[in-house]
Each structure stands twice: as C-alpha cells, then as structure tokens.
Amino acid sequence: MPQKRWNDHLMSRRAVLRHGANGLLAGAALWALPSVAWGRQAWERLDETRAIVDGRTPTGRGITLDLPSVSEDGASVRLTVSVDSPMSSDDYVEAIHLYALGNPSPPIATFRLTPRAGKAEITTRVRLNESQTVVALAEMSDGSVRVAEQRPRVTVSGCLIREETYGNGSDDTLPEPRVRMPRRLAAGEPGEIITLLNHPMETGLREDADGETIPQRIIERFRAELDGETVIDAELARSLAADPYIRFYFRAEEEGELYLLWQEDSGATAESRQSVSPG
C-alpha cells in the first residue's frame, strides 16, 4: 500500500476508535444517571402510585426505606420507613403509602399520621412473593411528595398460596392485641410503641384441601388515639404478613389514655387501652 494511503488508513482507523470510545463513555454516563432522569422509577409503573403522586414531582430526599437486602423467606419480611419531619402542627407527614410491586396484590398499607405521632417512622412485616421493588411514598402537609424504593432479594418465595404463609388466628373472634409501651416516656417527646395481633391474614388467593378457595379474611384497619385524638390511622392490605405487627410513635404532654383498635374486614374488632404517664 502506498505511504499516503496507509497514513490515511491509520488516521481513519484512529478516528473510528476515538469516536467509538467517546460513544462508549457517553453511553456509560447515560446509564449512570439516576432512574428519575430516565423517567423509569418503579412507582411510575403502577396506577395506584401514579394516582397518589398526581402530577407532582417526588423527591428522594428526606425519606428512608429499609428492608433486608436478602430475605431467606418472603413470608414475613421486616420493613421500616422513616421520614424527616418535625411533626409540628404546620409541618408534618400526612400519609405514608407502601407497595410491593411484584405481589399479586401490590398494596401493603397506608399510614395516615398526625402531629400527635411526634415521629414519622413505621415498622411492620410484609409478604414478598418474589425478589421485587418495594416503594414508599410520603405525602407531606405542604403538598410535596417523597419517594423511596428498595429491591430486596427473596430466596424462598412468600407466595400467598403457601399454607405456612398464614397465621393461626381463631375463625370467629379476634384475640386481645399484644402491646409494648415505652419504659420511659418524656413529656412532649416521641415514645415508641409496638403492637401485634395474632391473625392469619387470609388473602383469598389459596385453596383448601378440597380445592375450594379460602375466603379473604384480613385485618383492614388499625387506629391509635390519644385521649380521643388520632395518632395514626392505617389502611392495611393483603400484602401485610400474617400476625400483623406495627411499631410506631406517639407524643404525650400529660397523663392520658392510648386507645388501639384493630378491625377485620368482617367487622370484628380487637381493642386495647393503655395508660400514659409522661415523666
């Protein structure tokens, strides 16, 4: 090959390599952009979550969603969501919505809060049918929305048709809730409370030994009041684990009574009344 043609060939080859490398770098930079830049956040795939956002632009700041990165059994996976907020009368979290996008029924729960909560943090246990994305949306009193997403891996499915996924609650009555009050409660400071109810949380998605569908039977509502004022009002759904468990906070200024109500979709209820004595 003549020298000039050889030089032209080398220059063309170098240009191709250079442009190719630049293209790869540009592609890598695009893939490194957060999902919001692509409009591919998981919450956008579900009608219910899009309806909550309702045209607003969610932010990922000020909200944390915590689940184990790997769960050996998806039948009962611990989940904690917390939102940065003073929980004052003019600046508080109005609602926290939880969804498991890979479940046959994605809604987990909606927790509606008031400033009486004192701290916007909820812990519960959920069923995860498979490795999937879990979404938390927080609606704030100023009209803004915050979003957090996690993708836990499940090694054994919490499939909602597995018998061992369900608890052993009575068929006709609700047991007395178990409640753990804070050991020490300072006036005006958030106090942690944990409550649990033994209940199968039947989803209506599995069959009995005769092949008949077992009717849905779930706890659909939880409510906590302090001296008649709402602390938290929760709508619970089929993706909540059996024997539902809720950890939350309340703030008391003086002695009073904390009232807890669990309500089944049959209308049956279980109640607990706890004395509150801030130190």
Give a label for each model feature:
Residues 83-87, 197-213:
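Short amphipathic, basic-aromatic surface patches that mediate peripheral association
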Residues 141-147, 264-272:
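Short acidic/polar inter-strand loop motif in beta-rich domains
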Residues 151-157, 275-279:
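Short beta-strand edge segments in extracellular beta-sheet folds
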Residues 52-72, 170-186:
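N-terminal edge beta-strand
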Residues 31-62:
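C-terminal segment of N-terminal export signals and the immediately downstream linker at the start
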Residues 116-122, 239-247:
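Aromatic sugar-binding surface patches on proteins
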Residues 1-15, 22, 26-30:
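N-terminal secretory signal peptides
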Residues 129-133, 253-257:
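Extracellular Ig-like/FN3 beta-sandwich strand-entry sites
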